[in-house]
Design a protein with these regions (language model features):
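Short beta->alpha linker loops
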Residues: 32, 56-60, 99-103, 124, ...
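Metal-dependent phosphoesterase signature
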Residues: 47-50, 68-106, 114
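Short helix-capping segments at alpha-helix termini
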Residues: 43-46, 71-76, 113-114, 137-141, ...
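Active-site neighborhood of HAD-like aspartate-dependent phosphohydrolases
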Residues: 2-5, 9-54
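Conserved SAM-binding loop
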Residues: 26, 100, 118, 153, ...
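Helix-loop "lid/cap" segments that line or gate small-molecule binding pockets
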Residues: 40-41, 60-75, 132, 164-165
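Asp-based, Mg2+/Mn2+-dependent phosphohydrolase catalytic module
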Residues: 2-16, 109-112, 125-233
Length: 233
């Protein structure tokens, strides 16, 4: 892993595409979801909710349900709580009110100006993804949108990243993946993409330092990294 941009120009193969995760990378949604669950935890006296929610980061709704039941037991009323949490979330953030992470538009604009292909690979359902990107005014930046309900295996399996590269018509080895979650970095690494970790709620770990090509603090630093790495991966 490289954790700075100074030595990035040593590479020589052009990159063709960048594949983005959505929650925690484009939108500050994971923090919003966490807050909703914290409110439910206080209301219903659910213990250790923060760690439980963090364990679900980067997974599909199906896997999230499984993790919650594994954590709290088969009689945990997850469906009821999830419905209430979702209602709180949508009442606050629908209609373009979900805040974007700093540097999103700048990075997307840079990639378009560079002629790079752009895809989104999110474990979230397609309709939700499309609505959020459209409401934020950035849907048209993406050449392809691949979602969790379009692949058989969720992250950390590489399926969603491989499908994104396939639909873009690029080799995984010639694509960056921008992720904030451990499962996302694992998936991109397994798929032979070049993972860039931009941590959100989850801090970098020794495993992430090993699997990510670079760990950067925000998307504006990703622009600097790609400019330094203009000639390739």
């Amino acid at each position: 892993m490289r954790n700075s941009i100074e030595n990035s120009i040593e590479n020589s193969i052009d990159y063709d595409a960048v594949v983005f995760d959505m929650d925690g990378v484009i939108f500050d949604s994971e923090r919003a979801v966490m807050q909703c669950w914290k409110e439910l935890a206080e209301k219903y006296q659910i213990p250790d909710i923060e760690q439980a929610v963090l364990s679900c980061t980067g997974t599909t709704m199906k896997r999230t349900r499984e993790i919650m039941l594994e954590t709290y037991g088969a009689d945990f009323p997850y469906d009821t709580y999830a419905k209430e949490s979702s209602a709180i979330y949508h009442s606050r953030y629908d209609g373009g009110r979900l805040p974007m992470k700093p540097g999103v538009v700048e990075l997307l604009t840079f990639l378009k100006e560079e002629g790079k292909k752009i895809a989104l690979a999110s474990s979230t359902r397609r309709q939700t993804v499309t609505n959020q990107l459209r409401d934020a005014g950035i849907l048209d930046f993406f050449d392809q949108v691949i979602c969790g309900d379009m692949v058989e295996r969720s992250k950390p399996a590489p399926d969603i990243f491989l499908k994104a590269c396939e639909t873009l018509g690029v080799k995984p080895e010639h694509a960056y993946a921008i992720e904030d979650s451990y499962n996302g970095i694992r998936a991109a690494h397994a798929g032979k993409l070049h993972p860039i970790m931009v941590p959100d709620l989850l801090p970098e770990t020794a495993e992430m330092q090993e699997k990510a090509e670079v760990v950067l603090p925000d998307l504006l630093e990703v622009i600097s990294y790609l400019k330094g790495d203009r000639h390739g991966i």
